[in-house]
Amino acid sequence: MQRRTPPPLSSRPAAGGFTLIELIVVIVILGVLAAVALPRFTSLQSDARAAKANALAGSIRAAATLAKSTALVRGSACNASVTMEGSTVTMINCYPTGDALGIIVAANISATNDNVTLSYAAGPPTVATVEMIGATTLATCRVTYTASNVADTPPTVAVLTGGC
């Protein structure tokens, strides 16, 4: 009986890691997952901008009411400025004006901190517009404050979120 000799051992170590096919399959799977997740992530950003616009509108309404209450409590004239938390707020018809010295100060809105753009239209009535940066259409993702033209008539606050 003859003995069989085992095949010689290779001096080359066994290769480790992924094969090219495995790597391509993983990349394809990650690409499919990214394609599915991206629209959902974009939708979340749009919802967040719309929620931010609604929150700013609520803040503006509350600030206008608070400014009027402050003026009434202090016995100020309807067109006199009031001081709120150390800042002077210009008033017209017992409510903040629609400019940088009125409702923007009263609501403590900052273009830098709130990631918005601010624009104003001279009146009467004065109008302040707050647009959400990053919106697909700025004209339809904004809050507009229109100061009152008539004494003791509240200002109007309009919210547009269609283009957020």
What are these model-predicted stretches?
Residues 3-4, 40, 162-164:
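Short, intrinsically disordered N-terminal pre-domain segments
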Residues 38, 43-50:
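C-terminal region of N-terminal signal peptides and the immediate post-cleavage residues
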Residues 69-164:
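Periplasmic/extracellular, small/polar-rich flexible segments of pilin-like filament-forming proteins
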